[in-house]
Amino acid sequence: MLPDHIIVDFDSTFITSESLDELAINKFGNHPNGKKLLSKIQSLTNAGMNGDISFEESLEKRMRLLKINQNDIELLIKKLSQSITPSFKKNKLFFAENYERILVISGGFKEFIVPIVDKFGIIKSNVFANEFLYNLSGDIIGIDQKNVMSKN
């Protein structure tokens, strides 16, 4: 008998990498200061994960450095779709059959998590993650601070 819910993280669990680090690689790969910026993003990721700074502070600082838009998110979705953990690929049918029980909880963002987990039958309402705030041009101007996932 299965439990009522199966809780799964996204970064380094559902996918093999950290999504914001991958976003930074996409964004800064050809930038003149790319290596330095990537290193700073990865340091902030690690500092937040290790508790050296709050998750909220880590997230805010990374977002300020990234300066991303909707196009960057679309490119990230394509890249992350190729980074699904082998065990998740192998058990895709299980996820599709048990979609109501599967909860994805992440410090990442719904905008790139939902399109990926949707391919496994996991429903949007079962994804608990941060959400971006956009301006009228489609540029990401921040994160929804009312979302509980943006906190520690």
Which residues fall in each region the model found?
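Alpha-helical substrate-recognition element adjacent to the catalytic core
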Residues: 2-132, 136
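Short, flexible loop segments at the rims of nucleotide/cofactor-binding pockets, characterized by
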Residues: 78-82, 146-152
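Short, surface-exposed amphipathic charged segments that create phosphate/polyanion-binding patches used
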Residues: 137-148
